[in-house]
Amino acid sequence: MKPMKPTTLALTTTAALSAFSLQAWQTVAYARNSLSDAPPAPPNILLIVADDHGLDALGCYGNPVIRTPNLDALARDGTRFTNAFCTTASCSPSRSVILTGQHNHRNGMYGLQHDEHHFQCFDTVRSLPVMLADAGYRTARVGKFHIAPESVFAFQTVLSKGAANDPATIGRSPVEMAELSRPTIESADPRPFFLYFATDDPHRSNAFTPDGTTTFDTYPNPNPFGNRPAGYPGITPVVYNPADVIVPPFLPDTPAARAELAQYYQAVSRLDQGVGHLIDILKRAGKYDNTLIIYISDNGIAFPGAKTTTYDPGLQLPCIIRAPARRHPGAIQDAMISWADLTPTILDVANDTPPDAAARFDGRSFRAGLDGEKLTGFDEIYASHTFHEIQMYYPMRVVRTRQYKLIHNLAWPLTYPFALDLLQSPTWISATKTNHGEYFGKRTIAAFLHRPEYELYDIQRDPGELHNLAADPAFAAVKNGLIEKLKLFQQRTKDPWFSKWSYE
């Protein structure tokens, strides 16, 4: 075989390279087209759940006194929801809804998860961490858990354990929680992560009597809300003057209430610093832009008139969401969403909506509104409360629209029961010792403890929910229409208490 001439060799080589380049370009172009047609890669998911953080104590929600610079910055970079509601103002039941998309009367978490209560979800329930793990996510949790059984709410990695409201738990030290989360965030594992970051703050802190009994009794001193002289690693305490705090309208403006609100504010500011440290870790790892960040609370502020009630201070909560590829930072979303919608939304963002989602979940995805876009059909929410502690049986079912709220007190002849942390709060104790024990804020103590079967409020005209319209003939049509909505809700969500309609 004759050797090729240099010119021939050059031409042949050029042709071969051109052919290779064309093939390579076609391959890359095809890959690009294929990628553009495919759904985006699922993002990391960071779900931050505070404990008893009401709408009343965040700068971005209008409080000019509280210092929450990190959560305010997250709101400026994401979307702030103004009509977000938990479905029950009680810790374990609310968390079960957050992580299943089912109301607690359906998933079985009727009340608080403690050994003496034995409330837990049904074994057949599939939770968010399990579904995300099946979809290829790395799942981890840190901080407060307070739901059961662990087999239903299984996380691949448990970064910390601690009893609920344990004074020594890691859930009071949010910077340490963030540091424990660092390996999960910084891992080189190509799989996305789901991190459940649940603080004990700003829940009231408890102590133990010599015989080991839990107590919240600090009267006449305010509950410390987890604040302690020794402080916490990485935290710069922000101390508030009781004279400066803003007393919510449903609370009495008393020295006791102000002293406790000052402690509550300090716990919120500590929580905010932990969130800031966590987000800084995300940014330094280069994963902030590809992480869905959700900040919520399980229920409202731990004061009588909010927590464990179905009044708005217990149900209407902060919700700040920063979605990857957001186009409108600082957006405001006024759609009415509830915590039953969170699991369907997160799975939708993760491209893992199950085919039976409509039947499996009591909520629905609001992914289309994560960037502040107008959502249609999100104009009412439902709430369902049955127990808090085991002795606190007081089932309530609620429908709230933009104008009206109907509360059905199913066991209305009973005296409204008190959670231990609220009963022993100096704010409540001092109110019962003043004004002849007649008023708690603008509501009479008698009205707080003894409620009628139905409560109907015009939220727009009566945001304090003080004037019950249920017995007013002028509102009979409104009341009856909302009752029918409640019945359909209970049927649809398989509420065992629906049977009371037939025999009472």
Locations of the language-model features?
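Bacterial N-terminal signal peptides that target proteins for export
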Residues: 2-14
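N-terminal pre-domain segments of enzymes
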Residues: 25-41, 76
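Catalytic-site neighborhoods of secreted/periplasmic enzymes
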Residues: 97-195, 201-208
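Aromatic-lined glycan-binding groove of carbohydrate-active enzymes
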Residues: 395-410
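Active-site-proximal cap/lid insertion segments
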Residues: 39-43, 52-65, 82, 89, ...
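C-terminal segment of classical bacterial N-terminal signal peptides
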Residues: 17-27
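Short, structured active-site-proximal loop/turn typified by the sulfatase FGly-forming signature C/S-X-P-X-R
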Residues: 63-95, 101-105, 129, 133-140, ...
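Polar, glycine-rich mid-to-C-terminal structural blocks
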Residues: 363-368, 378-381
